[in-house]
Amino acid sequence: MGKGKFGTIVQIGDILVSEDVVTEYFACDYAVCRGACCIEGDSGAPLDETELEGLERNYPAYSAWMTERGRAAVEAKGFFEVDRENDIVTPLVSPEKSEISGGPDLATAQRCECAFCHFGEQGECLCAIEKAGCTKPASCSLYPIRITHLTGGGLALNVHHWDICKPAFEKGARERILVYQFLKNPLTKAFGEDFYEALSAAAKHLHG
C-alpha cells in the first residue's frame, strides 16, 4: 500500500485500488432506485473490447427480453457506440424514442436508456442480458467500481459516486457492508480469488 494524491492506494499486482473501495459502505437498494442507473446519465455502460464478441454471439438469446426500441437501437448502431470521452460503451436508445417508466425518480431523470434494458410489469428496469441468463458487461456487475486502464499498463479501481445511488451508500452504512464486500462475487470473477483475498487483507489492515 502507498499514500497517493487522493488517499491510500492499495496495489495488488498491476492493479491500483483506491482506498474508498475498502472503506466506503455500499449495498444496492433496488427497491428504491428500481434500476435507474440503466436509464440515467449521458453515456452507456463502459465496455471492454473483449466483451463485444459475446454481446453479438448471445444476441439471439437475450434480444427477446429487450424492448422494441432497444432492438432498433442495436440494429441502427450495433452492439456498442463511442461516447464523448472516446470510450466504448453500450448503445443508447434515442431520447425521443425512450419512454418514461416507473415512479417520479425515474420520470424526472435525464433519460438515456441503455439499449439492453428490460422493463418489468411495475416499470422497474432490469438487464435483458442477465434476464436471459447471459453474462452482462463487467462494468455493470462491478458498479459502483469503475475501471481505468492506465497509460503505462495496469488498471485502477475507483468508486464512482452518483446521486441516484445515494440510497445504496446509505443502506450499506446501515448494514455495515463495504463496497468490496458487496462486490465479492464480481470482483472474484473479474480478478481471481487471490486478488480478492489480498484486497480483504488490505481492508482489514486499513480498518485496524
Language-model-derived ranges and their functions:
Residues 1-208:
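Short loop/turn segments that flank or connect secondary-structure elements
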